[in-house]
Amino acid sequence: MGSSLSLAVPPGPLSFEALLAQVGALGGGQQLQLGLCCLPVLFVALGLASDPIFTLAPPLHCHYGAFPPNASGWEQPPNASGVSVASAALAASAASRLATSTDPSCSGFAPPDFNHCLKDWDYNGLPVLTTNAIGQWDLVCDLGWQVILEQILFILGFASGYLFLGYPADRFGRRGIVLLTLGLVGPCGVGGAAAGSSTGVMALRFLLGFLLAGVDLGVYLMRLELCDPTQRLRVALAGELVGVGGHFLFLGLALVSKDWRFLQRMITAPCILFLFYGWPGLFLESARWLIVKRQIEEAQSVLRILAERNRPHGQMLGEEAQEALQDLENTCPLPATSSFSFASLLNYRNIWKNLLILGFTNFIAHAIRHCYQPVGGGGSPSDFYLCSLLASGTAALACVFLGVTVDRFGRRGILLLSMTLTGIASLALLGLWDYLNEAAITTFSVLGLFSSQAAGILSTLLAAEVIPTTVRGRGLGLIMALGALGGLSGPAQRLHMGHGAFLQHVVLAACALLCILSIMLLPETKRKLLPEVLRDGELCRRPSLLQQPPPNRCDHVPLLATPNPAL
């Protein structure tokens, strides 16, 4: 009977990653596509870096003149009685000094019994630009709330874009969302630079954040879905490093331009050139998404273009690649997707558990950064440069740290370490602030900023790896929207003029400790295939600590057992 009766087990369906290798799509063509997906991240970073500078409050100085009875240039409130000679002299002395306070209520430098500057404000002293939106419309003192409102609306624009553009990315494709939002970023940015009122600027900045979020989400999905398991981390970190480079580039552009309107046009108008991405065969749709959506002909075309880019000009594809493309539906079979109702999605409890944990972790990682480094934390130019370079530098170091450790120790372990370091830094600053010298406080602040940056990057990557392709746009959009909402901690703190900062830090530190416990419930995705459908995503779970692993399937009974002579 021997080998002639041995049963050949039919090979299972190929995964998408194996299909890429079989077709020959991994190589130069894939790297070109990944590079095209990373380039828009530069302009997303430029847009993010612009808001702190455009809304940076300059040191205030009221122009004063010699007109009685107010020799200081400040106006008395209506309910004030007369001004004595001593009061007028005191007011003139106070106003003659250059005020360095940036308190939006102006209470830090207004003379006694005076609250309005009769003449123009002097906004000299900005670290980078000669003037910004604050100086354009005198958004100080009683109008200072408009600056905080603009910051909140810009962040809400990003959160709304991540949240609401995920569904179109799943329904109509990643490429269409990227092209549409990139094409609208240029006109929106130029329109914001030409706005004639602060209200128009706020509305267009909200829309700009909405569009930039769509770009960021779309290209993140396209980069991730084109990689095999060994490439995903490197590609994700490459996109983050491009974003860090965008922050450094923005400082250079701001030093050159000096005018905030010209700078706004400079960082948004070039996005119109991305319309060339619509050229057929240049910027390709995600082949993984096309297969899941059962658009087989389009998927064959995309894979063929990627494979042909890796071959010398004129050389035909191999026979194995041709057969795999022609029989794509049977080579890589995936269930056809359908429209999912919210009620049906509630049945997949493990997917929701992963979303809840990673969304909460991403929110805390972004919210707690303000406790280590306020945006534009100092009033002097040197303080602003230090804060900006510190934020960008720690983000770059976080990328290097993740690139060295994550593939060796796993996503979940390094995420747990990052949140642990974040909690340690917060507890040290909260409990030992009065006992630490300046060097120790700076060290713990840098540690907290570095670890929170690493936790935010890794939680986004881990979320993209556990969410199925069928709902990856919506799921990842939710995670990134929660991260954007975490950035509201800074404007919220400035809205209350610093009151309650200690309590806010205590709450966020406690939430960081809660994240440490919840991260242990996440699955490990290192070198694993991406889930394609909801059933695959439901299987992404951490093995139970109490349940023993199933024994290896081993047949201990020989096929041709010899009888025992003793019987």
Curated annotation (Swiss-Prot):
What's a single GO CC term here? Answer: organelle membrane
- Membrane-crossing ranges are 147-167, 176-196, 201-221, 235-255, 266-286, 350-369, 384-404, 413-433, 444-464, 475-495, 502-522
Q: Which UniProt keywords are present, listed alphabetically? A: Cell membrane, Glycoprotein, Ion transport, Iron, Iron transport, Membrane, Receptor, Transmembrane, Transmembrane helix, Transport, Vacuole
**What CDD domains does this protein's entry cite?**
MFS_SLC22A17 (cd17445)
> Where in or outside the cell is it found?
Cell membrane; Vacuole membrane
Q: Pfam families in the record, alphabetically?
A: Sugar_tr
Provide a GO biological process annotation.
siderophore transport
Q: Which protein is depicted?
A: Solute carrier family 22 member 17
Which species expresses this protein natively? Bos taurus (Bovine)
Q: What gene does the UniProt entry assign to this protein?
A: SLC22A17
